[in-house]
Amino acid sequence: VSNIKALIPGELQKVWELVLNTENYAAWRSDLSKTEAISDKQFIEYTKNGYPTTFTVTLVKPYRRWEFDMENSNMTGHWTGIFTAKGDETEIDFTEQVKAKKWLLKPFVKSYLRKQQTQFVADIMKNFS
């Protein structure tokens, strides 16, 4: 399990809309080459190297909570994002639970998740600085 919290200098509605607009991820996420919408509940992210991860949305509570399951050839997991208005800023609280499919990868999961989460938050921040 990996968790990251941050205070984004932007209004809740704008932060929410940025994060949930998965089709536009490639425009601002430094770790992705593209995203592909499969349906209104499923999308695929492709890394810069073209490696796909499939996401299936499991819960949407507008402007409060977004959850999805994720899977690729190396892992399965669940992501929870909680969004809270703090005046004209937004607190984000993102938690990822991931299981490596290959035992060789298990020792690296925690550090990989931390790196991914830190980059995701940094990319969000760039949109509001």
Regions found by a protein language model. Give the residues of each.
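A conserved amphipathic terminal alpha-helix motif
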Residues: 97-129
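Hydrophobic pocket/interface hotspot
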Residues: 15-19, 25, 43, 57, ...
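Hydrophobic-ligand-binding modules of eukaryotic lipid transfer/binding families
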Residues: 1-7, 55-56, 86-89, 122, ...
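Residue-level detector of beta-strand structural context in well-folded domains
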Residues: 4, 33-34, 43, 55, ...
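Hydrophobic ligand-binding cavity/cleft-lining segments
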Residues: 1-36
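Hydrophobic-ligand binding "helix-grip"
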Residues: 46-91, 97-99
